[in-house]
Amino acid sequence: MKSKKKVFLTGSEGFVGSHLLEYLVGLNYKVKALVQYNSFDNMGWLNTIDKKTLKSIEIVKGDIRDKEFLEKNITDCNIIIHLAALIGIPYSYEAARSYIDVNIIGTLNLLEIARKKKISKFIHTSTSEVYGTAQYIPMDENHPKVPQSPYAASKSAADQLAMSYYYSYNLPVTIIRPFNIFGPRQSMRAVIPTIINQAILNKDKIYLGTTNSKRDYTFVLDAVNAFEKCINNKDAIGKTINIGNNFEVSIAEIVKFTSSISEQKIKIISDKKRIRPKKSEVMRLRSSNGLSGKLLKWKPTYKGKSGFKKA
């Protein structure tokens, strides 16, 4: 039986978005999937999902910066899950204005339409990067915000904008703040796919940036489960909720772990092109799961290094 709830999903063709789309369809949600328009008619990861799932959804091609397009296509939806964003940190140093246009103005367009159409739930995606390097661990939602890159700053601004619509217009906003999601379909620009791919190709050398920084990695299937739990949860309205493992690991440790699984020695070569500006490097992130456990009854299925094995 199809759910009466119809989700407008931005960023549906991406890494997390494609997994979330499949998860929602599996739970009988109606989904209208926004795919970023491009001249190649490329639908990203949606090109790889099974035909049955693809036939069950409605796909629209456009841009979150195009307000008229959004107004036309959100009319028949009552839930917005907003994943679309420019996310590459290195590129944000070169093209900060693009991040303002997409991550802030694009979010504003969606919020305005959600307000006018009285959307029943607006789920906005944040990032743990807005916290900057951990000042204490585990990091709860009250941790100071110190964005250390133009990307993080644009996401922090979008977060504040989303929450302002909750306070100003009573828009039912929930902000999900994931800590380093990883898993199948992730871009090869990300560190874990880079390490795993080079190991698979039997390379004994891996070129990486900073290797002593620590992150809290969350498997993508756990992350999409948290998104869905927010849809029907009234207690999550007006809240920002961290989604992480409460388990930190350095990039060097991931290489060592991958080396043991692949049964080959891997040497790390420092690549200056992959190193962030010194004051921009986030050295440590580790999430508190207190609020996600309390409000969403959520906890990661793939704990510790088990997600790395699956990846």
Question: What is the predicted role of each segment?
Answer:
Residues 137, 188-198:
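A glycine/serine/threonine-rich, flexible loop-to-helix segment
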Residues 12, 37-38, 184-187, 211, ...:
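Structured loop/turn residues at secondary-structure junctions
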Residues 43-46, 159, 193, 252, ...:
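Short, surface-exposed alpha-helical segments at coil->helix boundaries
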Residues 1-181:
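N-terminal Rossmann-like NAD(P)+-binding domain of SDR-like oxidoreductases, especially those catalyzing
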Residues 157, 161, 165, 194-195, ...:
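Hydrophobic alpha-helix immediately C-terminal to the catalytic Tyr-X-X-X-Lys motif of short-chain
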Residues 109, 180, 186, 213-215:
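Heptad-repeat alpha-helical coiled-coil signaling segments
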Residues 22-26, 33, 58, 62, ...:
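C-terminal substrate-binding subdomain of Rossmann-fold SDR/epimerase-dehydratase oxidoreductases
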Residues 114, 166, 199, 230-231:
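Hydrophobic pocket-lining residues that define ligand/cofactor binding sites across diverse proteins
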